[in-house]
């Protein structure tokens, strides 16, 4: 009996080890194992989780701390269907977060385009927050594709100074794709283009 007990405990140890994170650091592991999820269950996304993701988005860095963004959380099923167009995953999502640039809050002149970087950083934060909450998400682009931007403008009744960068479809995952290993040393240089590590 004792032998059976120890065998069972050893098996549990192996299972625990195999289920451990690839990286010990939780944040790094979250980044490395995040992947696009395009299929969702019918379970709704809670208001608390939506707010957490929005807070994560607003925690992103911005040029001169302008925070030139506006977020629209869409949970209404009819609106989601309108917003989806050819992107079916949005229709079945529990929520879609539309990340927009607010040109009234953006820097002026050539620097105005920094809103794109700022809102992209916010988008990645939302994707990582979704992963941390056990949700699945996928980033679908709008700007600078005129047809997509116009479509979102119309559905969400946006004023001219609010420009949709992307629509993030989010829900409880109905698929578990294996994260891709995107590490490619040939895409890295040190000290100058083509430079090798010392």
What are these regions (language model features)?
Residues 1-4:
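Positively charged n-region of N-terminal signal peptides that target proteins for export
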Residues 10-18:
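Hydrophobic h-region of N-terminal signal peptides that target proteins for export
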Residues 6, 18-198:
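Acidic, surface-exposed loops and disordered segments
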């Amino acid at each position: 009996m004792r032998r059976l007990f120890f065998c069972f405990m050893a098996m549990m140890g192996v299972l625990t080890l195999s289920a451990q994170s690839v990286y010990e650091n939780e944040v790094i592991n979250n980044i490395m194992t995040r992947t696009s999820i395009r299929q969702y269950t019918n379970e709704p996304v809670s208001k608390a989780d939506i707010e957490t993701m929005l807070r994560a988005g607003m925690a992103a860095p911005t040029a001169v701390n302008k925070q030139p963004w506006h977020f629209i959380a869409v949970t209404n099923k009819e609106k989601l269907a309108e917003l989806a167009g050819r992107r079916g995953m949005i229709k079945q999502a529990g929520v879609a977060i539309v990340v927009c640039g607010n040109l009234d809050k953006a820097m002026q002149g050539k620097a105005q385009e920094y809103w794109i970087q700022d809102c992209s950083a916010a988008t990645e934060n939302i994707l990582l927050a979704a992963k941390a909450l056990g949700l699945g998400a996928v980033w679908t682009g709008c700007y600078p594709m005129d047809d997509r931007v116009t479509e979102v403008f119309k559905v969400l009744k946006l004023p001219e100074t609010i420009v949709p960068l992307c629509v993030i479809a989010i829900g409880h995952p109905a698929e578990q794709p294996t994260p891709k290993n995107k590490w490619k040393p040939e895409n890295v240089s040190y000290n100058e283009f083509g430079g090798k590590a010392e």
